[in-house]
Each structure stands twice: as structure tokens, then as C-alpha cells.
From Swiss-Prot:
Disulfide bonds listed in the record: none
Assigned keywords, A-Z: Ribonucleoprotein, Ribosomal protein
GO biological process: translation
Name under which the protein is recorded: Large ribosomal subunit protein bL35
Recorded GO MF terms: structural constituent of ribosome
Pfam families: Ribosomal_L35p (PF01632)
Organism for this UniProt entry: Shewanella pealeana (strain ATCC 700345 / ANG-SQ1)
Gene (UniProt): rpmI
Any one cellular-component term (Gene Ontology): cytosolic large ribosomal subunit
Length: 64
């Protein structure tokens, strides 16, 4: 049986942790002038992937 391939886009976006996967939050790439400093600071924090999305990500990262 051939090796399972890792989805490289998913590999770059998600990191495996003991409790699931962590990810970066969206809305911090452009159009930042109208967003408050507090909002941008909170968006810098990493967050957990929703439990319903974990199986799909785990399938795409077979060796994580």
C-alpha cells in the first residue's frame, strides 16, 4: 500500500497539540486601519480548532 500523503496547506496552517489542533485567527492580513488595537491584539492569539473539524484535519495530517 502506498504512503499516505500529508496535505501541505493543512500542515502549514495547523499544529498538533495534546488537546487537538491549534490555529491562527483570521482577519489580520489587510484592511487593518479601521480595526482597533485591542481587536488586532486579540486576533494575534492562537486558538483551538473546533471539535467538529478535528477529524477532517487529522485525516489530512496522517503523521501528525
Amino acid at each position: 500500500m502506498p504512503k499516505m500523503k500529508t496535505d501541505k496547506g493543512v500542515q502549514k496552517r495547523f499544529k498538533k497539540t495534546a488537546n487537538g489542533f491549534k490555529r491562527k485567527q483570521a482577519h489580520l492580513r489587510h484592511i487593518l486601519t479601521k480595526k482597533s488595537t485591542k481587536r488586532k491584539r486579540h486576533l494575534r492569539a492562537k486558538c483551538q480548532v473546533a471539535k467538529s473539524d478535528v477529524p477532517a484535519i487529522a485525516r489530512q495530517l496522517p503523521y501528525a
